Structures are given as structure tokens and as C-alpha cells.
């Protein structure tokens, strides 16, 4: 598997991964701590300048907003709802590209893991974008690395 060796990260992350039963029953605070962030909103940016706000919720749930700024893609510059799940330092989240501003008739899902290196925390992901092609549904694939920008936002973006 890609980057399997990188799973050996900070001790708090290893403790959660080593015990799936613990990860399954984690509180929002414990889930957030596995990602190296407090149990409030956190802001992330990827290599293309897209941003997301993650809010760790009940159980293993995560929600928030995603703002696409990737060159060559539509639905840019406005927040779209994000929903997902965490398992220890692993994460999966999805954005349906439809809000009051624009509907791109597509859905993107990311899966990945958080890792810490010194004071930096990143989420390394692969994504699948499902959209309507010229004659049928198509899937485009890629990868993103998100870097933690700030550990505690006082408010989330307005929809």
C-alpha cells in the first residue's frame, strides 16, 4: 500500500490505530486528538489552494465545508458541505458539488490518513470525482495533501 511506512507517526496516533476497539468508541475530543487538533473546527489547505474546515462530531463523524480552488475544475470559491467518518488517524469524507451558488452535478470522496512530523500535521488522501461525462458517468482520480493551517477557528464559513 502507498505510504504504509508513514503510518508510524506520533505516539497518540499509534495508540489509537493499535486499538480498533478504542477508535470505534472515541468521543469527538478523542477523535480530534488523534488528528492532532482540538475538538473544535480546524482549517486545512491543500497543494492547489483548496481549503476545508473540519468539525469532529459525535462518535467518529466529521463534518464541515470545502472550498475548491483547484485550477481546471468548476464550482470554485464557495463553500460546499462536507461529511465523513474517522477511524483513529484514518479519514474518509465526501462533498456533493451542489449549493445555492452552483451545481456541478458531481461528487468527490477522499480517503486518507493524518500524520504528524514535528509541529506539522497533514492529511494525505486519494480522491475519486464522479461526474456526468459526454455519454455516461465517469470517474477521475487524484491525490491531495492537506496541511493544518490553524488549530481552532472561532466560526465556520457561512453557506
From Swiss-Prot:
Temperature dependence: Is highly thermostable. Displays a Tm value of 62 degrees Celsius (apo form) and 74 degrees Celsius when complexed with biotin.
Subcellular location: Secreted
InterPro entries reported for this sequence: Avidin-like_sf (IPR036896), Avidin/str (IPR005468)
Example of a GO cellular component annotation carried by this entry: extracellular region
Cystine bridges: 75-104
Keywords: Biotin, Disulfide bond, Secreted, Signal
GO MF terms, alphabetically ordered: biotin binding
Residues given in the record as biotin binding sites: 46, 50, 66, 68, 74, 106, 108, 144
Domain Avidin-like: 36-151
Cited SUPFAM superfamilies: Avidin/streptavidin (SSF50876)
Annotated signal peptide: 1-23
Chief localisation class: secreted
Subunit structure: Exhibits a dynamic oligomeric assembly: the apo form self-assembles mostly into toroid-shaped homooctamers, with a small fraction of homodimers, yet upon biotin binding the intact afifavidin consists solely of the dimer.
Family: Belongs to the avidin/streptavidin family.
Domain-level remarks: The C-terminal segment plays a key role in the formation and stabilization of the octameric configuration, since the short afifavidin (lacking the last 5 amino acids) is only dimeric. The X-ray structure of intact afifavidin shows that the C-terminal segments stretch into the biotin-binding sites of adjacent non-canonical monomers.
Function: The exact role played by afifavidin is still obscure. Forms a strong non-covalent complex with biotin and 2-iminobiotin.
Protein name: Afifavidin
UniProt organism field: Afifella pfennigii (Rhodobium pfennigii)
